[in-house]
Each structure stands twice: as C-alpha cells, then as structure tokens.
C-alpha cells in the first residue's frame, strides 16, 4: 500500500469488503504493508467519487472516502481515524529499506514481529501489499517490500488468525494465475480458501485463508456481501475447487419404500444438500430455514 493509492476506485471495493466483516462483528486487523510513494500516476483514479453512480452500494463508505479525497496530503491515517472499519486495528509502520540483503532481511523480520504484536487481538488480518504474494519467499530480493511473503502468511495463520491478502493477476495467463492463487492453499492444506476478485479499474483479488471453525460464518459474510456487489466482484476458484460444497459431517440416509435412498448432508457453507439415488446427477441445496419449511410445511 502507498498513500498515493488512497481512495482510488480499488479502495472502494477493498474497504467495502473489509467493512462487511467488521460490521458483522469480526475483529479486523489491517497491516498496510506500507511503502513509499513512487511519483507514478497510480492511485489517481478517484473520479468515481464525483460521478456518484456507485454510491448506492455502500453510501456511508462512499461519503467518507469523498471527504478524505478532498484533503491535501491524505494518508492512511485518514482511513484509520474515519471509522469506516468499525473496531479495526492497524499496523502502519513502513516496510524498512536500505542496507545489505542480509540487513534488509533482519529488518523485515523485526518489522513483521512488530505487526503481530500490534494486531494481536485481531481475528482476521488483512495484508495489503502493493503487488501480492512473493512466491520465492525471499525478502532479500529487489522490490520484495512490495510483496507479502508466504512465510508471513503461514505465520499469521498458524498463530490462529484468519488471513486475507491482496494480489493482482498482472500478465499471468489463466493456468499460471490459478497456480498462483493456489500457492498458499498447497502450503497450508488445512486452510479453507476463498478468492474474491474486484473488476472495477485494474483487476484486484483478495485471497482468504480461513480456519475450519470459522468457515461457515465467513462464507455467510462473503455470500451476503457478494449478493449486493456481484456486478463488481466475482468469486474465483483455486486448484482445490469450490470447498463450500464439502460435506462436513456424516450423512443421514433414509431408505424409501420404493427402494430409493435419500441422503441428507451438511455442507461447509452451512447449507443442507439432499440427494436421491434415483436421480444421482442432481441434488437439492437448501438453507436451514428452507429445509425446516419443507419438512414441517410452515
């Protein structure tokens, strides 16, 4: 993240997504992965605030970003003070530069440890690097400050946090992109994946690694958010596939008098899946209320 990006069209989608979690009672911790402004024109796309055609999606957020964009020398502290992410914590220290490769590595390690201390009471940590995930996992590389390292993602997840980090497709072809999205899910195979991609302006993706115990709750938040923002966000799948359909408990099987077997299963997203052996290629998916209404006819 750079201060020059603040309030651009990408920020609207980003803060709306994080706000969905914060307003649902999830304690969000933001590590900006802050880097120096570079003098480029990136982050200048704020005219959407003047047009106003996207305001209806999240009016309170839209209006707050409009206030901030009119300030001179706006910084991430303006976001932190605005309250757009209720109850959120922040780590705003810039990623250290300078020195030999070994010195940069040591500085990076200390910086990251400080971030965990600052965000210790978070449930979901959002990491906002400039360019996404550095697959090589090498903090000594040139421009590594623009990336989150796989070791850092794993450290957060193993520390009990759910994690979401920013990345973008760039020039990757489809196969390379799916492999890239799958990197952390292959490394942390007990994490439940979700990937939401924002299509307004430059494509931006948000990769979630969710603990099993929180997956149903987080899926509910994501689904509710996406039902409103579906024109601008799409869900992408990694090589693992769509884990929302995974069965989480032993199925309940009913044998009918005509010989058919009806199987009732609970899915990872909390919905109920019903299959009939006489029609094995199709199944019915219901939420809990729909299931109860069908059973009790109320």
Predicted regions: what is each one?
Residues 193, 239, 245, 262-264, ...:
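Generic structural motif
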Residues 1-254:
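Class I S-adenosyl-L-methionine-dependent methyltransferase catalytic core
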Residues 32-36, 268, 278, 290:
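Short glycine-rich, polar/acidic loop-and-turn segments at beta strand-coil junctions
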Residues 245-249, 279-298:
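Mixed-charge, Lys/Arg-enriched low-complexity segments
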Residues 259-286:
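Acidic, low-complexity, intrinsically disordered interaction modules
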Residues 253, 263-265, 291:
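Compositionally biased non-globular segments, especially hydrophobic aliphatic-rich helices
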Residues 102, 175, 219, 264, ...:
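Generic alpha-helix signal with a bias toward terminal, lower-confidence helices
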């Amino acid at each position: 993240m750079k201060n020059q990006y603040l309030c651009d069209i990408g920020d609207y989608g980003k803060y709306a997504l994080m706000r969905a979690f914060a307003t649902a009672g999830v304690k969000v911790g933001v590590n900006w992965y802050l880097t120096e402004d570079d003098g480029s024109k990136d982050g200048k796309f704020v005219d959407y605030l003047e047009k106003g055609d996207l305001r209806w999606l999240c009016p309170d957020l839209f209006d707050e970003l409009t206030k901030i964009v009119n300030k001179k020398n706006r910084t991430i502290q303006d976001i932190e003070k605005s309250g757009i992410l209720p109850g959120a914590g922040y780590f705003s220290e810039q990623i250290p530069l300078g020195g030999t490769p070994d010195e940069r590595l040591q500085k990076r390690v200390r910086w990251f440890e400080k971030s965990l201390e600052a965000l210790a009471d978070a449930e979901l940590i959002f990491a906002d690097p400039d360019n996404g995930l550095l697959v090589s996992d090498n903090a000594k590389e040139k421009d590594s400050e623009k990336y989150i390292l796989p070791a850092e993602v794993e450290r957060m997840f193993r520390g009990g946090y759910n994690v979401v980090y920013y990345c973008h497709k760039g020039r990757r072809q489809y196969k390379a992109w799916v492999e890239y999205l799958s990197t952390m899910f292959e490394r942390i195979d007990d994490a439940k994946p979700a990937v939401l991609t924002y299509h307004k302006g430059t494509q931006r993706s948000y990769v979630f690694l969710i603990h099993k115990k929180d997956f149903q709750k987080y899926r509910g938040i994501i689904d509710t958010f996406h039902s409103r923002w579906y024109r601008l966000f799409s869900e992408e799948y990694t090589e693992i596939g769509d884990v929302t359909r995974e069965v989480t408990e032993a199925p309940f099987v009913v044998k009918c008098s005509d010989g058919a077997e009806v199987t009732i299963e609970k899915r990872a997203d909390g919905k109920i899946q019903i299959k009939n052996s006489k029609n094995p290629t199709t199944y019915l998916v219901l939420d809990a209320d729909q299931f109860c209404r069908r059973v009790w006819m109320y």
